[in-house]
């Protein structure tokens, strides 16, 4: 079953993009650029963004390039973004307009850290609540590459769509005639990513090589 994204009914969830991971995840600069591209593109498309930070006394604060300018950050200890506070915020933003087909939350784009812990538990919580979930494989990571790959398999088994930063943004645009098209394409192009240096390909397509030892 296919699912075409509509930016009127989509939100971006960025999970725990914290400084703890900067010297622990291989290819972290690529992942940060992709997350930044998602945040900036969703801002341009007027898609709501929600961000969490996990137990900052251990995992430090948000990576500087990703510090929020116009979206909330929810502090948590739960291994899922779908906390009571975040759910309450979603209910306040969307439920009063539930009868408006252009302003309800149907689909979540999910990126951040770590794939096998908070990403997978967030995705499963959202699916249980009836949302469609798209995990951005080149904008999420685990410190251990084996955990990352195994988690993608589990996500796919659970009905999560696995996609990439560029693919999901073009799906949101839908048409070159979209007045936002030029700006979004610029954001995609300006990531300045060197594919041979950071990516490998397997059954899920192009992915980051995460482990420092790879």
UniProtKB/Swiss-Prot annotation:
Entries under InterPro entries matching the protein: Isochorismatase-like_dom (IPR000868), Isochorismatase-like_sf (IPR036380), Isochorismatase_domain (IPR050993)
Membrane-spanning residues: none
Family, similarity comment: Belongs to the isochorismatase family.
Protein name: Isochorismatase family protein 2B
């Amino acid at each position: 079953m296919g699912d075409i994204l509509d930016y009127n009914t989509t939100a971006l969830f960025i999970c725990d993009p914290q400084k703890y991971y900067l010297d622990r995840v291989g290819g972290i600069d690529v992942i940060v650029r992709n997350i930044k591209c998602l945040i900036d593109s969703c801002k341009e498309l007027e898609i709501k963004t929600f961000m969490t930070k996990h137990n900052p006394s251990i995992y430090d604060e948000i990576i500087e390039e990703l510090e929020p300018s116009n979206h909330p950050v929810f502090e948590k200890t739960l291994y899922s973004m779908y906390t009571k506070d975040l759910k309450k915020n979603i209910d306040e933003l969307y439920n009063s307009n539930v009868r408006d087909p252009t302003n309800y939350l149907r689909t979540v784009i999910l990126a951040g850290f770590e794939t096998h812990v908070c990403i997978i538990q967030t995705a499963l919580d959202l699916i249980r609540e009836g949302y469609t979930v798209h995990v951005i494989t080149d904008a999420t990571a685990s410190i251990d590459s084996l955990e990352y790959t195994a988690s993608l398999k589990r996500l796919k088994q659970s009905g999560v769509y696995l996609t990439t930063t560029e693919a999901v943004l073009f799906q949101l645009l839908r048409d070159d005639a979209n007045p936002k098209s030029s700006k979004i394409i610029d954001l995609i192009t300006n990531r300045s990513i060197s594919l041979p240096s950071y990516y490998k390909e397997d059954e899920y397509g192009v992915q980051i090589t995460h482990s420092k030892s790879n």
